[in-house]
Amino acid sequence: MLSNFIKGALASIVFCASVWQVQAAEVIKLAHTANISHVHHEAAQLFAKGVAERTQGKYEVQIYPAGELGDQPALAEQITMSALDMAIVSLGNMAMYDRRLNAMTAPFLFKDYDHAHRVIDSFVMNWMNKGLAQYDAVGLSMFDYGFRQVTTQDIVVNTAEDLKGVKIRVPPSTGLMAAFDALGANTQKIAY
């Protein structure tokens, strides 16, 4: 009779232990293609820390840097297939799924940073997400890399006319390539 009591007590203790054990955090996979000293990685780390703190450890963001899970087009594709939870990719890569997003890669859209952030935060994010919804993709925010400069080896570019016939290397963004083509430049697509 005592052994039955002990068995019952042990079973109760094991049951209680399983009820009281800490639940493992739900993992969110976030990938990017930059090295670990890049601002994308720093932003990913800050995001992961914020998620852990604000959810009190319920969620853990695992970061896959430096292209561990693929290049930007592959990461964008994984997002649309629900094979990856989050990624930091260029707008040009998401434009593969909604061509209208190419409009945001055109040069000379904004007069300054304040103007850019007002437009992006109030209108562009909602507009962009409507187009990406059919792919189960949602943009949370946009990075800016600063206003772009045109850099050439030996030609000074002060006006759009100065670009006529000049070879310009651009990321594989349909919108960016079309904009420079329209300005008369000879665009060359680079790996990005």
Predicted regions and their residues:
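Bacterial N-terminal signal peptides that target proteins for export
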Residues: 1-10, 20
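Sec/Tat signal peptide C-region and signal peptidase I cleavage site
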Residues: 18-24
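Short, well-ordered beta-strand segments
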Residues: 29-31, 62, 87, 169
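Extracytoplasmic "Venus flytrap"
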Residues: 29-46, 66-71
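Short, polar/charged alpha-helical segment
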Residues: 37-62, 122, 175-178
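Extracytoplasmic small-molecule ligand-binding "clamshell" domains
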Residues: 46, 53-54, 60-87, 110-112
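Contiguous mixed-secondary-structure segments that line small-molecule binding/active-site clefts
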Residues: 49, 80, 85, 90-188
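Short beta-strand-to-loop elements that line the ligand-binding cleft
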Residues: 61-70, 168-170, 185-192
